[in-house]
Amino acid sequence: VPFFYERHGGNFISASINKHVYVSINQINEKKFILRYSKLENVSNINEIQHPIIREVLKYFKITPGVEITSFADIKSGTGLGSSGAFTVALIQALSIYKNSKKLSKRELSKIASYIEIDVLKEPVGLQDPHASSYGSIQYFKISKSGLVKNYDIYNGNTGLKNFVKDLYLINTKKRRDASKE
C-alpha cells in the first residue's frame, strides 16, 4: 500500500492460478449502460452506475451510453484471491480494445488498474493484485519509493519451481472477505 512503499519501497512475489475473469463488451442501439455482473444495472447516466470499478473505468476511457458490459468469473468475489484486481484488469483491457482497438501492455494494464483502485476509488489495497493479474505466472516485483514497479518472471525455465507448483493444492474454505473493509 502507498503509505508503506512511499517510505520504504517494497517487494512481493505473486503466483497466479489458472482461473479467469471474462468481460464482454457490445455496442447497443440504446443510449444506456447495461451492465451484467452478479447484478443487473440499466442506467442512462454514468454517475448512476452502482458498481464503482465499472463506473470509474468507463469514465477513464470516456465511454458514452450505448454499451453493454457482461462479466463472469471462475471464482467469486471475496475469496481473497485478487478477484477485484483481476476484474479491473480484464475490464480495462476489454474497454481499451473496444474504444481504441488497442491491446494494452502488461505494464499499462497494471498501472491503470492500480490508479483506478488506489487513487480514484481510494480502496485500501496494494499494487499486488493488478500486477499479478496483468503479468500472470510467478513473478517477483520490486516497488521503488516513487511507486515504480519492476517485475521479474521467476517461474519461466525453473524446473524445481515447476515441480513444486504441480504439487500445490488450492482449497476453498468458503470464507469471504472484503479487502476494502479491513
Predicted features, each with a name:
Residues 2-12, 29-32, 97-182:
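ATP-dependent small-molecule kinase catalytic core of the GHMP/sugar-kinase superfamily
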Residues 18-116:
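Anion-binding (especially nucleotide phosphate/pyrophosphate-binding) glycine-rich loop
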Residues 8-13, 20-24:
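Short secondary-structure capping/turn segments at boundaries of alpha-helices and beta-strands
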